[in-house]
Amino acid sequence: MNQFFRRVLSGLALLVAVVGTTGCQHESQAEQETVRTVSYRAVLESNKPVPEKVDTWIAAMSQEDKVGQLMMISLHGSTIGQSQKDVIRKYRVSGVMLTNENLINKNQVKTFTSDIMQTAITSSMVTPYIAVHRDRILHGNESFLRLPKPNRWGQLPMDRIINLATRSAIEMRDMGFNLVIGPNANLGVPNMSYTSDPTWAGHINLAMVERYQINHMWFAYNYFPAVTLGDASFGSANEAKAYLSNNDVAVFKRLIAQTTANSYMLVMSHIQIPAIDNEHLASSSKPIIDGWLRKELGYKGIVMTDRIDVGALQSNQKIGDYAVASILAGSDLILVDADTIHIDEVHRALTQAVADGTISTERLNESIKRILLMKMQTQMDP
């Protein structure tokens, strides 16, 4: 009899264990199903305020998605074939910047940008930046409105600048771009700067970006804090900052103060200013990005690097290591060229840095939040 009861009790215990385990499995599956049903499009199209949308999506994002949002890449070719789609999907990148290699004619460009967007949407990715550096488009390219060379803009009257900027913004928008790398805020750089006058440079930049905003395009002022110091040398950080604050940085200060938040980003140059940071280029310098730009000048938006392979070469570092250093210094978005080896190396380095805590979850989420605060602005939805 005792043996009988022992068997019954054992059976009941087993039944309870099975039921309990099954319940846990159902609960786990339900939780997983809940996660699966939270889509980027659903969050984006909800009636929540943008900051709430951002927090909701950050909580739902995988580490893979977050790391991808730190990368803006370029692609080879004039069409989006399977290999290009595979790169976009594999690395789940924040955006794609088209270069002259990708720009053949208007219809081809429209198809190219549309295919990028559709690849992202069908892969449940965050809205991608589809960017073009307008000042770097070759003048012989018949696909685009012929604009003045950069160093000629400053010689034009304001009504002409506004007219050309308006036509260019409409053209880029209609081709499928949503981000312009530009305008340029630097002073006195041959073949790059619009003018040497900081006041006039500010006027030109603000006039251009007003046309971009009207046509629902994001933009990126470049290059902070400067691209050259000429013959200037400095004995201290304060001396260097004072000099630049009367030159290029004077323009950036005005642009930061007078431009709508979350509509633009700043691009870092690869200049080195030893008086401020004797070890790092500006694009990987915490004293310049986090200290000067963010804390002293009060800039709260996205910081993007210029091409990271160039910075890595100048600093004699591996491209992946340089990308990690740039994020740790305060950058949010790493610009990578079309070399798939470079893309993979940067992605691997960032993934490893997040996994081992070199880039903390808090630091990672800071960048993701800045990027999403821009991308989730409703007027910019694809």
Q: Which ranges hold each PLM region?
A:
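Short, well-ordered coil/turn segments that N-cap beta-strands
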Residues: 69, 94, 124-128, 176-178, ...
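Enzymes and membrane/adaptor proteins characterized by extended Gly/Ser/Thr/Asp/Glu-rich
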Residues: 87-204, 223-240, 269-284, 301, ...
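N-terminal hydrophobic targeting/anchoring segments and the immediately downstream early-domain regions
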Residues: 27-130, 134-139
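Mid-to-C-terminal alpha-helical segments outside catalytic/metal-binding sites
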Residues: 352, 356-382
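C-terminal motif of bacterial Sec signal peptides marking the signal peptidase cleavage site
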Residues: 19-23
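Bacterial N-terminal signal peptides that target proteins for export
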Residues: 2-10
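Catalytic PLP-binding core of fold-type I/II PLP enzymes
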Residues: 290-303, 307
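Phosphate/pyrophosphate-binding betaalpha-module
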Residues: 207-208, 212-223, 244-263
